[in-house]
Amino acid sequence: MKEEDTKKKADVAAWAYALRLRTLPLSWAGTVMAAGLAASVGVFRWSVFVLMFFTASLLQILSNMANDYGDYVKGTDGESRIGPRRALASGRIAPGEFVRGMFVVCLLTMGVGLALVLTAFGWRAIGYVLLFLALGAGCIVAAVKYTVGRRAYGYSGWGEVFVFLFFGLVAVCGGTFLYTGRWDALWLLPGAALGLPSSGVLHLNNLRDAEGDRANGKNTLASRMSLGWGLAFQCGLIVGAIVLLLVYMDATYRMTLWYLPTALCLINIPLTVQI
């Protein structure tokens, strides 16, 4: 009996490790920002927030699992990898079992996503329902195709672009639309401001793995750059996010006085990188 309990605990620990739950806050950021934008115009709804929260979490988990599986199949997660070993590469979960787990997460994502769209619009707004179902399908495909398949976009340097689109623009603009049912071009500013540092998270990981990725034919943006240019690009993403957020604050709330202290912070960034 004790052996069975120990095995169950080991299985749970292996799956928790495979899901990479520590990355979930990255998916929550877009949900929280969309909720804040909706609340600022008085249309926040808890039901939409909760369903959006779980949909974003499941998409992040699916992306993590697909990344693990794709790199394992292509042999990228070898001994040369600097970061922590993934669940498949370490042998903690069998490949067939892992694929079944991905399928379950995919079904859960579709179910919760459908509930989110119907809660936001109902069946009467069938045009919006179909639009967001198509958008949701695109999110699922993008989550899987990062490293899975012969044309995985993560292996051709497009990872940061897709993260910018889906973790930034789609999460914030699409999420806010689910609350309001209307479009505002100003949402592109906070959406892009979130998308840039989200891309920075991926870029920083790829900088860490650049040497191993080059050896395994994974042509990420970081593997095509020198370390110096990679760090400069990382700083550009962060600075760009700050500038876009300031522009949005000024356009929406006329908070021009924020520019001065922020400019002083930006001046110090090159010094910080040199140190």
Question: Where are these predicted regions, by residue range?
Answer:
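Extended hydrophobic alpha-helices typical of membrane-associated regions
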Residues: 250-275
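Topogenic membrane-insertion module of multi-pass membrane proteins
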Residues: 1-51, 55, 150-153, 163
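C-terminal ends of transmembrane helices
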Residues: 64-67, 87, 141-154, 202, ...
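Membrane-embedded alpha-helical segments that form the functional core of polytopic membrane enzymes
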Residues: 33, 41-66, 131-144, 184-204
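Hydrophobic alpha-helical transmembrane segments
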Residues: 16, 24-28, 46-54, 99-103, ...
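Intramembrane alpha-helical segments
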Residues: 84-182
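Small-residue-rich segments of transmembrane alpha-helices in multi-pass membrane proteins
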Residues: 25, 29-33, 161-176, 223-227
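Solvent-exposed interhelical
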Residues: 66-108, 195-240
